[in-house]
């Protein structure tokens, strides 16, 4: 498996930047290419928000996973739309955060990704080295196929709580996004959790909006940016953990020097975690 993944990685085109690697490049990680780093540098010439926002997003995801593992006792995670998954410091991984914060030794993580470049990179750099991690080719817009994937069905225990982190709602139109959230909340076992990350232009200064829109248009085809009210609508009826739907730096900050703490809206992303009854 490792040799095949590495061969596939070698055949990938790397001339164009993609958001799944830009996030890593902006956070100082190693799972990116020159095109991604060039775009981050170009964007930082306009505003330094790219690097700090990337840090804020990764720190949020790390806190969510850490809380669910350490406090809620979750030992199964499905991370949907993960790109090349990282933790808050360059090169660290979200499944490592789960393992380090869980009181148990057998935390299982399934990454689901549809972008072929991100998928192959993750398969080459994660699966060969981690027995309790799987990387699955899946598209949240094809819910039956994603949930019915043999790895998803057998690697995770669907009789026990699962934490699903939905990181790609920005790729869905309103009707599809509502359907996906509804399907996920009814598919997972009782006592599971649904975490959400969603990009927004709320709080983006008017003079920076064209640059932000331009970068995102280059890297996120089919982008659906939502306001706080629109994101809240996706979560309607769900029991949100405190502090509810907030800017990602505001979700259970744990001290230290969190990115975007002085201006949470500069993170450009909302986050929330819901308990599934």
Regions found by a protein language model. Give the residues of each.
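Short SAM/SAH-binding signature in class I
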Residues: 156-170
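Short alpha-helix
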Residues: 221-245
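Short, glycine-/aromatic-enriched active-site segment of Class I SAM-dependent methyltransferases
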Residues: 205-219
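A short, conserved alpha-helix within the catalytic core of class I
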Residues: 143-148, 171-183
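Short "lid" loop at the C-terminus of a central beta-strand within the Rossmann-like core
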Residues: 169-172, 199-203
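Rossmann-like AdoMet
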Residues: 1-138, 142-158, 185, 268
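Conserved beta-strand signature within the Rossmann-like core of class I S-adenosyl-L-methionine
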Residues: 163-166, 187-199
